[in-house]
């Protein structure tokens, strides 16, 4: 009986925690910037170096998050809602640029991401857990 209660409590806690997150996919289409791997950050935490033709999908806690690349001045603020699904494309126009993010419509982004490969787990350094500014 005690084991069942413990499992039920664990399930409820996990369900509640899962309900307080949204999904953020950061991706970069194949482009002509060979060797250019801008680093994606969420709230100052390193996520990954995003290679052309790759993506990383992660959970982010509900609340405001700031996504930046190597240049913190080119960030984007994103209000993550529980159960929300967000897509950020890494773009650059010159080799000297550190990369910027643009929020992409989910339908368009899914079509692009379906043609890409996920980054390997050992290439992803972090997750986006707490909202910037205390949510």
Residue ranges of model-derived segments:
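Positively charged n-region of N-terminal signal peptides that target proteins for export
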Residues: 1-4
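N-terminal leader/targeting signatures
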Residues: 6-7, 37
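Hydrophobic h-region of N-terminal signal peptides that target proteins for export
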Residues: 10-18
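Short loop/turn and low-complexity linker motifs enriched in small/turn-promoting residues
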Residues: 18-135
